[in-house]
Amino acid sequence: MASYKARISLSGTEHKIVDMVCSEIKEIASRTGVEIHGPMPLPTKKLVVPVRKSPDGEGTNTWDHWEMRIHKRLIDVDADERTLRQLMRIPIPDGVQIEIQIKS
């Protein structure tokens, strides 16, 4: 049976949902008996957008700061074909992006 190395990177704006998908991947790996490394948390990106409060430009300069955080996790799996098929069937919630790189 062919063995593959899969690197799964997850990113999303809500860390609880990203961690939930990571736990589903870990559960599939433990059921099939393959080796797993991770989830490794990567640095969180903070995107800040300063916006002027007054629309006309008159008055004092007051600003609102809107922030969005992007949380990332990285998982390495030594998987066979059966495990990869099960990983492809995981329901991914909205707001979570997943990328799978496979090396043979």
Swiss-Prot record:
Similarity comment: Belongs to the universal ribosomal protein uS10 family.
Signal sequence region: none
Gene Ontology BP annotations: translation
Pfam families from the UniProt entry: Ribosomal_S10 (PF00338)
A GO-annotated cellular component: small ribosomal subunit
Organism placement in taxonomy: Archaea, Methanobacteriati, Thermoplasmatota, Thermoplasmata, Thermoplasmatales
Molecular functions per Gene Ontology: structural constituent of ribosome; tRNA binding
Entry keyword set: Ribonucleoprotein, Ribosomal protein
Annotated protein name in UniProt: Small ribosomal subunit protein uS10
InterPro entries (UniProt xref): Ribosomal_uS10 (IPR001848), Ribosomal_uS10_CS (IPR018268), Ribosomal_uS10_dom (IPR027486), Ribosomal_uS10_dom_sf (IPR036838), Ribosomal_uS10_euk/arc (IPR005729)
NCBIfam families (alphabetical): uS10_euk_arch
Function of the molecule: Involved in the binding of tRNA to the ribosomes.
Subunit structure, as described in the record: Part of the 30S ribosomal subunit.
